[in-house]
Amino acid sequence: MNRNLHHIITTIITVFISVTLYAAHTNAERLSLLQPLIQYDLAFNTGVTTDSIILWEKLLTPELEKQQRYDILFQLKAMAVQSSITEGNISLAIDNANSMYKKAKEIDYPLGTALALRAIGNTYLSSSTPQVAIGSYEEAIEIMQQIPEADIYLKNALSQMILIKLNNRQMAGIEKDINYLEALCDKRPDSPCYFYLPCCRAFYEIQSDKLPSALEHLQKMERIYAKHPYPYFLLLIKYLYASYHIAAKEYTQALQSYDELLPYVKESGSYKDIQISQERAKVL
């Protein structure tokens, strides 16, 4: 089972869905389209392509720096790094993540440093060095824990780290990590970010071969998605259902989950569609 799931978490973090390019002519329009991503620290949203994010980061940076809107600036820079990863331009992503880290240090902005470390972790993950990626996430989490307004980023970074550890069978201390995530999520149970808790629990139960419990958490994910229909959530649901069906030896259903997912991935232009197709082929 683990071979079939080897790249799932990497793909979850790096693939974007983007189906429509909006013609945003002003920075205000661009920020408006990016608002759902900024507000909930989401990896992507329909209507904003990876190319748009990379371009808009360049266009918006001077104005955001002038206004000292570092909270938006560094999140946008992190999005641009992620977009480069999604397009397969890992070297550019690494350069931009390191530049982001240097900038945050220069202006002494801890949240920017934490977001840069998380972005660096994403580049390591895409370079198939998960252990180094985990180290970057741990550094980011340590900084975020000291920043009250970093709560949403802390949940995201922690859930990413948990998923990577699970994918690499690093089970030591994983329950402690999940319990910590639960304590964070319980502060705002109505927030869309609560989605990440059943997501991590579902994958943990799949890896632990506790499939009935895994299914319950998958169903919780679906209920949250019904209230907060963000495309990123749907992507995670499809991936984890595929892994659930593989673990349950329900290969027809696993293929169906992949088939429902692939059109979105191909439409996004992500280089990951080939990888997902290869994983699907292993199920045949």
Residues covered by each model-derived region:
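Compositionally biased, intrinsically disordered low-complexity segments enriched
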Residues: I8-I9, Q219
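A "functional boundary" signal
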Residues: L21-L284
